Every structure is written in structure tokens, then in C-alpha cells.
């Protein structure tokens, strides 16, 4: 289906994802590469076997979903190009915000599942007999079709964080890495992916290598690479053996390192960890 056939909305549907990636890691990585486009309300990854390699990212604003779709279409993610389109229908969370949410009739679905063996039994007892119109269960197979209106149970994630551009690409106009529109969080609380208030950091002379501190325990090389790879001149991330809370990020020159430092200073990878960035000592 072509992207243009579905009306732009807050939710993007992504498929062709690497099925070997664990669910938790997949959610964190999607979170890391898409949150720069705007506030993310949810990331949905299905437990259903038929929905492996697929996910939904729900943004607060439609414009954020549009920017994400245009910028990340075909981007190589875990060695597979992502295929992205708008979701065919609003997710539950967006429908509730719009006042259009309708509770699914789960009892009717369960009744259909129960009556399927009865219909099959009649057919087996009377070879060649046609099924009667309107008999519950004739369309039971349709229940397993994936989609937002009859979706399988989804894994839930709240929060956000930035993405990788193709080399040389710059963030969309007006969007700084990690920036998110004002959300509904109580005063003083930040969702993951938001910038914490700037705190004074001891200054070292400019350097092409950045020193990161206050990183959460789940930080890994891939996650940091996704955060910093969007900036021109990025070379590599170096973790410190035995230390999960610090890392080094190298750029081609001091100017490029400084730009990344300024943009990601105070970035919250998790609710409790605001990343601190300084120039490494020479």
C-alpha cells in the first residue's frame, strides 16, 4: 500500500524490522531514534507471532509523525530498511484524546471462537452441506488479521529519545535532537527523552572527544550511537569496561563535538538519568 493512500495521523506503522531483536531492546531503540521528531505517547510492539517485525509509534502531534515518516523511510535499522506508513486508524490513546474511542466488543469475539467447532462438526457430519448464512464462526479466521482496530495485546512503553539521520542529514527545521513539545507531565517531572534543566558542568578546553557521565545501567553502544550518529563528524562510541555510567564519544573535530554536546546536554535517557556531557581532558 502506498503511503499516500492513508490520511496523515499521529501514529506510524513500521514493518520489516529485524525479528531477531528482543522486544525490550527493540522498543528502546525505536524510542531512541524517533523521539527527536516530537513527544511520543506510546511505542507498541506486539507479542503475537504474526506481528513480529512490526511496531507502532504514537506521537502527540501529527506533524511529528509526518517528519518521522519522511526522514526515516527506508533507513537501515538493525541491517534492514524500515518500511513506514501512517496507521490506518487512530490508536486507542489518540481516539480517547479525540473523544472517538469505542470499546471493543470482546464478548462477541469470544462467542465466535466458541462456536467455530460446532460449525465444523455440522460440516463433518453432513458432507457437502453448505454453511448457513449468518451462522456465527464462519468468519472466525478473520479475527486473527492484524490491525489497529482488532490488534493483539501490545507491549507498552512511555517516554522518548533521538534518532539517526543518514550521513550528512540535518535535523528537521526547528527540531533539536531530543527536543519534545510541552507535554502533560506535572511540574518538575520529565518524561524520558526530555532535556533536564542545564546544570553547571566543570569546563575543560574544547576537544573532539566528549566525556559522558550519569548514564543508566542499561546504556549500550548501540543506544549512544543512535543518539550521536545524527551529528556531522561522528566517529565512534567507546564504553569503559566495568563502568556502565560513563562513556566517550569521538568526533572529527572540536566544533562538531561541541555542537553535539550543546544539543544533547541534559538529555534524559531514562526518567532518573540526565546525561551530562563535557569535553574530555586532553
From Swiss-Prot:
It holds the Pfam family RRM_1. One of its GO terms (molecular function) is U1 snRNA binding. CDD domains: RRM1_U1A (cd12477), RRM2_U1A (cd12480). It is found in: Nucleus. Keywords: mRNA processing, mRNA splicing, Nucleus, Repeat, Ribonucleoprotein, RNA-binding, Spliceosome. SMART domains: RRM (SM00360). Its main location: nucleus. GO terms for biological process: mRNA splicing, via spliceosome. The keyword Nuclease does not apply. The keyword Signal does not apply. GO terms for cellular component: spliceosomal complex; U1 snRNP. Residues 10-89, 208-282 form the RRM domain. SUPFAM superfamilies: RNA-binding domain, RBD. PANTHER family: U1 SMALL NUCLEAR RIBONUCLEOPROTEIN A/U2 SMALL NUCLEAR RIBONUCLEOPROTEIN B (PTHR10501). Component of the spliceosomal U1 snRNP, which is essential for recognition of the pre-mRNA 5' splice-site and the subsequent assembly of the spliceosome. U1 snRNP is the first snRNP to interact with pre-mRNA. This interaction is required for the subsequent binding of U2 snRNP and the U4/U6/U5 tri-snRNP. Snrpa binds stem loop II of U1 snRNA. Belongs to the RRM U1 A/B'' family. This is U1 small nuclear ribonucleoprotein A. The gene is snrpa.
Amino acid at each position: 500500500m502506498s503511503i499516500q493512500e492513508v490520511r496523515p495521523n499521529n501514529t506510524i506503522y513500521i514493518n520489516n524490522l529485524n525479528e531477531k531483536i528482543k522486544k525490550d531492546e527493540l522498543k528502546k531503540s525505536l524510542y531512541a531514534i524517533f523521539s527527536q521528531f516530537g513527544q511520543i505517547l506510546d511505542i507498541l510492539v506486539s507479542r503475537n507471532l504474526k506481528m513480529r517485525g512490526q511496531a507502532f509509534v504514537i506521537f502527540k502531534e501529527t506533524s511529528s509523525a509526518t517528519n518521522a515518516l519522511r526522514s526515516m523511510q527506508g533507513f537501515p535499522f538493525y541491517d534492514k530498511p524500515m518500511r513506514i506508513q501512517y496507521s490506518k486508524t487512530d490508536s486507542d490513546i489518540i481516539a480517547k484524546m479525540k473523544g472517538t474511542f469505542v470499546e471493543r466488543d470482546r464478548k462477541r469475539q469470544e462467542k465466535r471462537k466458541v462456536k467455530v467447532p460446532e460449525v465444523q462438526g455440522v460440516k463433518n457430519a453432513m458432507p457437502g452441506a453448505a454453511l448457513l448464512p449468518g451462522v456465527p464462526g464462519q468468519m472466525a479466521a478473520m479475527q486473527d488479521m492484524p490491525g489497529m482496530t482488532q490488534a493483539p495485546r501490545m507491549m507498552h512503553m512511555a517516554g522518548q529519545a533521538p534518532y539517526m539521520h543518514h550521513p550528512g542529514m540535518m535535523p528537521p527545521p526547528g527540531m533539536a535532537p531530543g527536543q519534545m513539545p510541552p507535554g502533560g507531565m506535572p511540574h518538575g517531572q520529565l518524561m524520558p527523552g526530555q532535556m533536564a534543566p542545564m546544570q553547571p558542568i566543570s569546563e575543560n578546553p574544547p576537544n573532539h572527544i566528549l566525556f559522558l557521565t550519569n548514564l543508566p545501567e542499561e546504556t549500550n553502544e548501540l543506544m549512544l550511537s543512535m543518539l550521536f550518529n545524527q551529528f556531522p563528524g561522528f566517529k565512534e562510541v567507546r564504553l569503559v569496561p566495568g563502568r556502565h555510567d560513563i562513556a566517550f564519544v569521538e568526533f572529527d573535530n572540536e566544533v562538531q563535538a561541541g555542537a553535539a554536546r550543546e544539543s544533547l546536554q541534559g538529555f534524559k535517557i531514562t526518567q532518573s538519568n540526565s546525561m551530562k556531557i563535557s569535553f574530555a581532558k586532553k
